[in-house]
Amino acid sequence: IITGGIDLSVGCTYAITGIVVASCTVTYGMNPILAIIVGILIGAVLGAFNGFLINKLKLQPFIATLGTMSLYRGIAYVVTGGVPVTNVPESYRNIFNGELFAGVRSYIVVMVVVFVIAHIILSKMRSGDYLYAIGGNEEAAKLSGVNVIKTKYVAYIFCGICAAIAGMIMLASLGSAEATAGQA
């Protein structure tokens, strides 16, 4: 939203990531850390696809992400057949849902780390200034030398990664993933 755009597909990115990571750990017996890396990559790819539609095909962010919301939800239904993926191994669940110290769960630490990274980017780095500049006036930002396309790509990729992390945390909390996850 800072860049003057919007991503309506975050709930579906959240769902697809949970489904893929659950399938990797349950069906294929993948190592949980490797499954998390796959989940982050899924979020980045889905975010990059949104960035492609908006930057290269010049679609309005609302329309592009409304379309990818439907596309990603459809993929989630096709992959699962509408049936939740259950029985996620404890080894995965403990990564995001385990207690670290004094009752603090690991997902709290993950949330704080993501918040700190976002805060540093937005308030301490030039790229954060670029994000605000694009949201304020994209044409003026472009004339000021900001690489608008690259910056918007990175914003959508970061958004996808954040949605993926949320999906993986919810998977750890619930122990299952389904195509309807992330719906309002």
Give the label of every model feature segment:
Residues 1-28, 52-59:
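Single transmembrane alpha-helix segments in multi-pass membrane proteins
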Residues 12, 16, 45-48, 112-116, ...:
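Hydrophobic alpha-helical segments embedded in the membrane of multi-pass proteins
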Residues 12-16, 33-41, 63, 108-113, ...:
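Hydrophobic alpha-helical transmembrane segments
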Residues 23, 28, 45-57, 75-79, ...:
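Membrane-interface helix caps of multi-pass small-molecule transporters
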Residues 29-69:
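Alpha-helical transmembrane segments within multi-pass membrane transporters and channels
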Residues 57, 61-127, 151-154, 173-182:
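Transmembrane helix-bundle core of multi-pass membrane transporters
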Residues 63, 147-171:
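Transmembrane alpha-helices
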